[in-house]
Amino acid sequence: MQVRLSPAVARAVLGVSPAELDGAVVALDDLWGREASRIREQLGDASSWEDRFALTDALLARRREAGSPVDPEVAWAWDRIVVSRGLVRVDELAAELGWSRKRLWSRFRSQIGLPPKRAVKLVRFDHAAHRLVAGQDAARVAADSGYADQSHLHRDVVAFTGVTPATVAGEPFLAVDDIAWTSQEAPAKTHASGVLRR
């Protein structure tokens, strides 16, 4: 099962700030200890995918409730980035919050795990990648997604994935996940493929 967490809830669910992980791949056992083993057993004992999804959804909701939420301003900034599909400027976010760019960068980085400018690029890339998978023309995707031109889109695709846009367009996991970042308040959505999004 794959679970994709919004960065706005990742700290609460994981029990550690994404900034502390610094992009490292960490085993769930290292984060949750024995609880990870119990979850693995429960998922293995479940008789259907629906039961596995229900178990996972309940676990995520419980951990989110018990965990430390991000600051409301940081959650608002993340949601604004997502709603704009990565087309908002960081200085606009800071101005709307009444914060300096430095304050926004510091709080956002410490709670979300990446600087706001990188988050903007990531969300813009994600939106563009999903449009490529949907079969849209790369030049049109680049223009509509706020890239200066197709070569800038190509550069971001290679930087984020290590492969070309044509390769990304054929990635099957993107075809079942219409968007990566839902609003932090949205309920989990499950798919028959075994992908659970929150």
Q: Predicted segment positions?
A:
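Long, low-complexity intrinsically disordered regions
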Residues: 91, 105-110, 114-120
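A secondary-structure capping/hinge motif
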Residues: 108-114, 156-166
